[in-house]
Amino acid sequence: MMQGLFFEGKHEQQCVFDRYYRTNPFQGGYTVVAGLEHLIDYVHNIHFSEDDLAYLKSTGFFQDEFLEYLKDLRFTGDIYAMPEGTVAFPQEVLLRVQTKKDEALLLETCMSMIMNHESLIATKARRVRTVAGKDNLMEFGLRRAQGKSAGVYGARSAMIGGFNGTSNVLAGAKFGMPVLGTMAHSWIMSFSSELEAFRAYARQYPNNLILLADTYNTLKQGVPDAITIFKEMKAAGTLPKAYGIRLDSGDLAYLSKEAHKMFVEAGFPDAIIAASNDLDENLISELKAQGCVINSWGVGTNLITAKDSPSLGGVFKLVGQYDDGKFVPKIKMSDNVEKISNPGLKNVLRIYDKETGKMKADIIILEGESIDESKDLLLQSDKAPWRSRTIPGGTYRVQKMLIPIFQKGELVYQKPDLKEIMAYADQQIQTLWPEYLRLVNPEEMWVQRSTKLSALRDKVLKEESAHFF
């Protein structure tokens, strides 16, 4: 497409593309935006190397004149986006690109891959955090991840979603994340007995004393052997503040309760009981409902692969272009009504209740529109007009959600560190009422188009429809 536009003389036409999605993953009530830092690095460094150009030439698809043009191609436009950790909803503009058309097309695939994947994992992680409460959450997914990049960036996304650390050492090094983990069954099987394996581990890692208790028999051997080690270390004055076991199989609710009883009777009521074994938010919720005594969770496969919703349907659509210096809104029509796009240069205004700090609604606007917080605000529903309601002036505040990231090809955004992103993500979740956080049948956030945007959409739809009727 880029080459075709080049020879048609349209490659440098200024245009606007929006990135958004249509449906929340996991049948949930929200999506956590992630991947912006990864995207920034990609955009900032995008270029064609000599090897890239040589390969493109070898395919036989590309002409020399176009390949010569690609040598100096860099991103020269503007990007606006919601910051990482932002809670978002269907149809909202998550990211807006204003640039030459060939540059936008060059960004589309990688941009979609990065933000679809990382937002998906961050959202899954946040659902796990919601049910885990204040428990420790460890990301254990690398061995089941669909590739190195998915494992590394998935681990970072899990942190944005609320996890405490990862077993992925590369991710820890790359992003400054806490590296957490325990032993494997192979460690225990490498020694003459489980007790000797535990003793050896305690010698080597006295401050990381989480012993894997289910290699042979959890309650008859694993837990008693762990208690023996704890007693030996206590007598020697070397028992760390944090110590305990991990369960990786069996009835986790029953085993954790029985193990806890044994620890209490032995004088170790504070022993940590960690659990793993194909966990996700649904299973953790069930285990807690059954009274499990688990306060640390290793979540791997179902998180890193987003098993029950393995893709986020984010799209990147042309919403306007400049023809002879005049901005012309564009719309994608479809036989599926939900796939009809919103034309024009847009932003999102978020409405918060001043008293509670909770989110009340999002309004998709045309860029330049504003809301007077002192005046009553009418929320109108296209689907259910009888649900329309008014928010009294003075009781709400408004926040514009898209902020500048690149301007004229230059990075103008000060990238926050991961801890800052995590704190912001936590704050965002706190603005949602619990009804929006439910795992099953969550409340749907109120999202509407502004009156001006609705009018523009209707106008462009009518103009485009005239070609067919």
Where on the chain are the PLM-derived regions?
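Glycine-rich phosphate/ribose-binding loops and adjacent secondary-structure elements
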Residues: 186-364
